[in-house]
């Protein structure tokens, strides 16, 4: 009897000890604030996944009649995501996590999670919802208003977007001690300031206009054959898909579609890129695909073990644009790559003997410099002028120095000053041409020229250890992508932009590489 009781007592004690161990283990896990934050971050990432795919659907395949209901749904989703990012307990978790022992990757993850949390918590939920609704309404209407050069109709919707964006900029400025525009820049280019951009762009303005004029004069005596005829959209798409294969795009985790404004969306495991086709020529859509494939390869190459956390995301939009412009400008317009494009284009359009598809002619088409109205169709040399114009306008708009109604006139003045073109009465090819401002993405435009500068710097560094031209000529670009993966893609947001660039190239941003690249390509 005593034995039974002792045995029974032992079993009970063992069960209690086991239970205590499990409870203590669970408590230890639950008390690990960093793990809580990572789990919560992945939850937010899943909803952002849905938002991104739905955004692609809206731009690429949604019928026009679905716009109003879609706007409501996306606004509701935005509010939900904002609610997740601003839950009260997160402040305590961040405070606790900062006292925990974390490795270098975990420290970077915590830093980036906290940065995004701080950016989200300053905005009231009502403003987030209002911005989503106003942005969706403005963007959808813009698609037809731009075609009709309807500034008056566009201005009515855009007024609300600008007002709400200015409110956001002011709130962020008060929370961070920055100027309103600097506070918006922080969303796209962490650590970059207006002062830095003013300095870099002011320098560009001292040499770019004269370089453009010299190159245009130099090319005036060169003959080339412009594409003429009919280039079916389905053939252009097939050509684009072949070029994407050459660039080693992962079709198991992405696809190509068509939209009014080319873009790269989706998520790293499901990247969606789009282009637009003009059946009277093939040049623009093809290089647009090369550009967006650069964005896509960066997304597909981000560190998978950090997926769902901010540290596993792209470092900045400038670095993102550096990858698309590396593909488009550094690789895509090189003589070795043009040879591949010429051969593939001739095959897909059944015109191998057409002089349009001769390598030297395609090379001239893709390095032709001319002053034009449209940013997305601009050549490599005039593109920075388009960006600087937009930067100066959005900077003054967010800082309250100008009104949104001033924009058409200011646009015309700056286009005349920088490119010698007037957009007076031609707003569809002026201030209405871009999608960015329709949803309040103020602060994004500088990323394009920063990206071009980073791309030139990356290429200069890469050529020290990689036979770039040899790899392109061979048709196996793996050595190029291996360098990008090792130095850029796999790093995600583990380092600041300056640290990332310095690790890859030995120095922080140096615009002289960009200037040297342009001089080498267009003056030699």
Q: How would you name each of these model-derived features?
A:
Residues 3-4:
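Polybasic, lysine-rich low-complexity intrinsically disordered segments
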Residues 30-190, 519, 523:
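A well-structured
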Residues 131-282:
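Contiguous, non-catalytic segments that form substrate-binding/exosite surfaces or channel walls
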Residues 33, 52-55, 65, 69, ...:
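C-terminal, non-catalytic "cap/extension" segments appended to globular domains
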Residues 284-300, 321-325:
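Active-site recognition of the HExxH zinc-binding catalytic motif
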Residues 18-30:
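Short, Lys/Arg-enriched N-terminal segments with co-localized hydrophobic residues
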Residues 313-353:
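Post-HExxH zinc-binding segment in Zn-dependent metallohydrolases
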């Amino acid at each position: 009897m005593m034995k039974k009781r002792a045995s029974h007592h032992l079993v009970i004690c063992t069960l209690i000890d086991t239970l205590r161990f499990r409870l203590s283990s669970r408590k230890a896990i639950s008390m690990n604030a960093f793990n809580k934050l990572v789990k919560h971050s992945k939850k937010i990432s899943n909803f952002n996944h849905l938002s991104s795919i739905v955004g692609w659907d809206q731009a690429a395949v949604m019928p026009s009649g679905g716009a109003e209901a879609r706007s409501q749904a996306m606004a509701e989703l935005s509010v939900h995501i904002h609610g997740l990012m601003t839950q009260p307990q997160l402040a305590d978790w961040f405070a606790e996590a900062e006292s925990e022992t974390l490795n270098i990757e975990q420290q970077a993850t915590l830093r980036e999670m906290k940065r995004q949390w701080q950016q989200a918590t300053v905005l009231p939920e009502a403003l987030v919802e209002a911005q989503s609704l106003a942005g969706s309404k403005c963007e959808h209407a813009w698609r037809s208003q731009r075609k009709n050069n309807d500034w008056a109709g566009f201005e009515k919707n855009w007024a609300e977007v600008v007002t709400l964006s200015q409110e956001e900029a002011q709130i962020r400025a008060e929370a961070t001690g920055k100027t309103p525009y600097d506070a918006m820049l922080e969303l796209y280019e962490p650590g970059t300031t207006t002062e830095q951009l003013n300095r870099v762009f002011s320098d560009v303005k001292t040499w770019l206009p004269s370089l453009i004029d010299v190159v245009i004069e130099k090319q005036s005596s060169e003959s080339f054959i412009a594409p003429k005829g009919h280039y079916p959209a389905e053939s252009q798409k097939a050509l684009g898909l072949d070029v994407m294969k050459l660039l080693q795009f992962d079709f198991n985790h992405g696809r190509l579609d068509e939209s009014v404004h080319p873009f790269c969306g989706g998520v790293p495991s499901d990247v969606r890129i789009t282009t637009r086709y003009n059946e009277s020529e093939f040049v623009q859509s093809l290089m647009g695909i090369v550009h967006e494939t650069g964005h896509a390869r960066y997304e597909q190459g981000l560190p998978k073990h950090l997926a769902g956390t901010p540290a596993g995301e792209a470092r900045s939009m400038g670095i993102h644009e550096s990858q698309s412009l590396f593909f488009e400008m550094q690789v895509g317009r090189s003589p070795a790559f043009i040879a591949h494009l010429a051969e593939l284009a001739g095959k897909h359009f059944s015109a191998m003997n057409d002089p349009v598809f001769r390598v030297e002619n395609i090379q001239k088409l893709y390095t032709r410099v001319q002053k034009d109205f449209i940013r997305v169709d601009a050549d490599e040399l005039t593109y920075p002028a388009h960006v600087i114009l937009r930067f100066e306008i959005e900077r003054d708009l967010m800082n309250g120095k100008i009104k949104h109604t001033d924009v058409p006139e200011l646009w015309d003045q700056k286009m005349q000053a920088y490119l010698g073109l007037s957009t007076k009465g031609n707003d569809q090819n002026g201030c209405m041409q871009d999608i960015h401002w329709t949803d309040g993405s103020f602060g994004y435009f500088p990323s394009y020229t920063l990206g071009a500068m980073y791309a030139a710097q990356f290429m200069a560094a890469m050529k020290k250890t990689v036979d770039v031209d040899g790899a392109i000529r061979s048709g196996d670009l793996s050595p190029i992508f291996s360098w990008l993966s090792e130095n850029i893609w796999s790093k995600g947001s583990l380092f600041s932009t300056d640290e990332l660039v310095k690790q890859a190239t030995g120095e922080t941003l140096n615009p002289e590489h960009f200037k040297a690249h342009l001089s080498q390509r267009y003056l030699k």
